[in-house]
């Protein structure tokens, strides 16, 4: 499993619009091959900052499958105009996975 981590700085004053747009756009990733789960969290200290966590089966499911798809173009159209600056996206793999 691969965890995509994106820190999203949304233009001030557009937080509510972004959340609404994300609520609509999230169906785009949920239907992608290799998608496992996602969550969007809002920062308590910086009200315009969010973190998007998406779990994919493989790195390529995100970087090739999703980003190379027509669905990614729709995702961009719906969400990218909210960001300033453009988000840095990194990918992580578990070193010590959670235990039951």
Pin down the residues of each PLM region.
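An amphipathic, aromatic/His-enriched active-site/gating alpha helix that lines ligand/cofactor pockets
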Residues: 24-36, 55-90
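Intrinsically disordered, low-complexity segments enriched in polar/charged residues with Gly/Pro
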Residues: 14-15, 26-29, 40-42
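Short, well-ordered beta-strand segments in beta-rich or mixed alpha/beta enzyme
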Residues: 2-9, 39-67, 92
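Short, surface-exposed ligand-recognition loops at beta-strand->loop->(often short) alpha-helix junctions
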Residues: 9-19
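Glycine-rich beta-strand-turn "strand-cap" elements at beta-sheet edges
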Residues: 2, 39-46, 76-100
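Residue-level signal for secondary-structure boundary sites
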Residues: 16, 60-62, 97
């Amino acid at each position: 499993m691969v965890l995509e981590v994106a820190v999203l700085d949304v233009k001030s004053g557009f937080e509510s619009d972004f959340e609404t747009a994300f609520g609509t756009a999230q169906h785009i990733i949920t239907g992608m091959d290799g998608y496992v789960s996602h969550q969007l969290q809002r920062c308590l200290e910086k009200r315009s900052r969010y973190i998007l966590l998406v779990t994919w089966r493989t790195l390529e499911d995100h970087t090739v499958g999703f980003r190379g798809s027509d669905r990614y173009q729709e995702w961009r159209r719906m969400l990218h105009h909210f960001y300033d600056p453009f988000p840095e996206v990194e990918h992580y793999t578990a070193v010590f996975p959670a235990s039951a």
